[in-house]
């Protein structure tokens, strides 16, 4: 699976290989009038806030931006420090953010397996059905513990009109998720 931890992901060799590829992608994107967006995930090479900051420090290029998905930074060891982690991301990376995701995060209880949703398509790529691994589950917005008030407030400080893409939901859940997000935007004066 693309989502399960691999030991090489957290080595200097793995980081250097990833850095070279991302550097090349950033240059190529920039040469074609685009920006390559990095989306992090805890089990990937770039998964923590510190690893993200390190990557942007080493690939300081206008062709590289961040796809902000705060839920992808949370693991069992830091989910209880949610506000601290959210503030750390914004305090160190806000100028790199180009697009934002809206989904949620919560502890998965006793289920430590890789989690996938039944989206009604048995042949769907795992990237479309993935909903978390280990002790963390990544449901649709409003179905978890993400501090959306803080997330949207911090996001809007420098990015008031940023595209926010809802993910990890089924088609029939779109109205509920949209109502949830609209309510959070309104409640925070956004």
Give the role of each language-model region.
Residues 2, 41-43, 69-75, 102-107, ...:
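Active-site beta-loop-alpha junctions enriched in small/polar residues
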Residues 17, 24, 51-54, 88, ...:
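Alpha-helical elements of Rossmann-like donor-binding domains used by nucleotide-donor carbohydrate transfer enzymes
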Residues 36-38, 64-69, 98-101, 162-167:
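Hydrophobic faces of well-ordered beta-strands that scaffold small-molecule active sites
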Residues 1-68:
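Active-site acidic/histidine proton-transfer and metal-coordination neighborhood
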Residues 108-111, 172-176:
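Short active-site-adjacent structural elements
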Residues 15, 49, 72-161:
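Gly/Pro-rich active-site loop or hairpin
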Residues 174-189:
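C-terminal helical cap(s) of enzyme catalytic domains, especially alpha/beta-barrels
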